[in-house]
Amino acid sequence: MPLASRVTLGAGCYWGTDKFIVKDFQKRFPGSVKNASVGFMSPDPNAMKNPSYRQVCSGSTGHVEVLDLELTDPQAHYEELIRFFYMFHDPTTKNRQGNDMGSQYSSYIFTYDQEQSKVASRVTKELQDHISRGTLNSFESETVKTKIGDATVYYKAMQEHQDYLASNPNGYCNHYFRFKSWPKA
């Protein structure tokens, strides 16, 4: 069954998520990403409609800061993207990435079809197995807390937040590579 081409990921502050995927993931897989933007999505389909950045940052809306993108070839790149997603943020912290705290900084994989959900769950289990075996020990705790759930409504963030680190190379980013390549099984 074919995978959906749309992908929405929460990995803490969306500026770093955008930079690591749009720039760094595409270094590994040139031309793999198109139509990327940062914004907000809530796991709750009944969450506040069209929240502002300030409202999301208050932690009261239930929205997660996300990168929303389209893959040119989801069959070839979705699984690699999910692995890459786990390489540059800490999926073992709940509602936090570094100094950024609050539910808006959750580690979250929003899925658009059953195949995406299966792949995301399998890769997440692989990561947990590597952590449990001690193959990977670059995270704060030993339990993956990333949530996987159905995508809901995406709200694009204000224009000045789009491509932020490309325009402000010295801007705030707490993401970094915790490991450089996915361990062998």
Residue ranges, per PLM feature:
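Flexible coil/turn and secondary-structure edge motifs
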Residues: 1-185
